């Protein structure tokens, strides 16, 4: 008799739910019902999946607070993704990791700038030394005759009798 009563009760609950769903779906204002139902389904699945996970994590881990915080942040991030948001919740640990990464990259870039600055200073010093060596020589000491290959050419003062041998002379010819 009890089984029959349970069966009747179960059938009446199912009938009541079916009637309720049919009346809700017939109402034109409930156009968003499938979306609401899918969100509720996801929330229920997350609830059912997270409770055993949390129990196991709390029993097996030494730092239960971090695990609980990580699980809650993960659940909220999942809900935000389902809602279509691109932003995520981050914990202080993740922010500290990102800050450490940024600081490390800045240090690396500062070292690179320091190396480049040192190299540039060395190049400037080298150019200064080259310039100083070039400026020490005066033009009076440089013998240009070697450069233009004119060692045997005489100047006007060195010519005999001060006459230019290349000037044309009067030539008389017999006819």
Curated annotation (Swiss-Prot):
The keyword Membrane applies. Plays an essential role in the virus replication cycle by acting as a viroporin. Creates a pore in the host endoplasmic reticulum and as a consequence releases Ca(2+) in the cytoplasm of infected cell. In turn, high levels of cytoplasmic calcium trigger membrane trafficking and transport of viral ER-associated proteins to viroplasms, sites of viral genome replication and immature particle assembly. Keywords: Activation of host autophagy by virus, Calcium, Enterotoxin, Glycoprotein, Host endoplasmic reticulum, Host membrane, Host-virus interaction, Ion channel, Ion transport, Membrane, Metal-binding, Secreted, Signal-anchor, Toxin, Transmembrane, Transmembrane helix, Transport, Viral ion channel, Virulence. It holds the Pfam family Rota_NSP4. One of its GO terms (cellular component) is membrane. Residues 1-28 are lumenal. Homotetramer. Interacts with the immature particle in the viroplasm. Interacts with host CAV1, early and late in infection. Interacts with host integrin ITGA1/ITGB1 heterodimer. Interacts with host integrin ITGA2/ITGB1 heterodimer. Interaction with microtubules blocks trafficking to the Golgi apparatus. This is Non-structural glycoprotein 4. The chain crosses the membrane at residues 29-51. GO terms for biological process: monoatomic ion transmembrane transport; symbiont-mediated activation of host autophagy; viral process. It is found in: Host rough endoplasmic reticulum membrane; Host membrane, Host caveola; Secreted. GO terms for molecular function: channel activity; metal ion binding; toxin activity. Belongs to the rotavirus NSP4 family. Residues 52-175 are cytoplasmic.
């Amino acid at each position: 008799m009890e089984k029959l009563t349970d069966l009747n009760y179960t059938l009446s609950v199912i009938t009541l739910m079916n009637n309720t769903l049919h009346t809700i779906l017939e109402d034109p204002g409930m156009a968003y019902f499938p979306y609401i139902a899918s969100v509720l389904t996801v929330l229920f699945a997350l609830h059912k999946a997270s409770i055993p996970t949390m129990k196991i994590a709390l029993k097996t881990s030494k730092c239960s607070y971090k695990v609980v915080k990580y699980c809650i942040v993960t659940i909220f991030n999942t809900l935000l993704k389902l809602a279509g948001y691109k932003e995520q919740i981050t914990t202080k640990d993740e922010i500290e990791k990102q800050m450490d990464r940024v600081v490390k990259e800045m240090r690396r870039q500062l070292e690179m700038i320091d190396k480049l600055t040192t190299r540039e200073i060395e190049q400037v010093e080298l150019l200064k030394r080259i310039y100083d060596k070039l400026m020490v020589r005066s033009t009076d000491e440089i013998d240009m005759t070697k450069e233009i290959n004119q060692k045997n050419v005489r100047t006007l003062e060195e010519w005999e009798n001060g006459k230019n041998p290349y000037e044309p002379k009067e030539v008389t010819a017999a006819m």
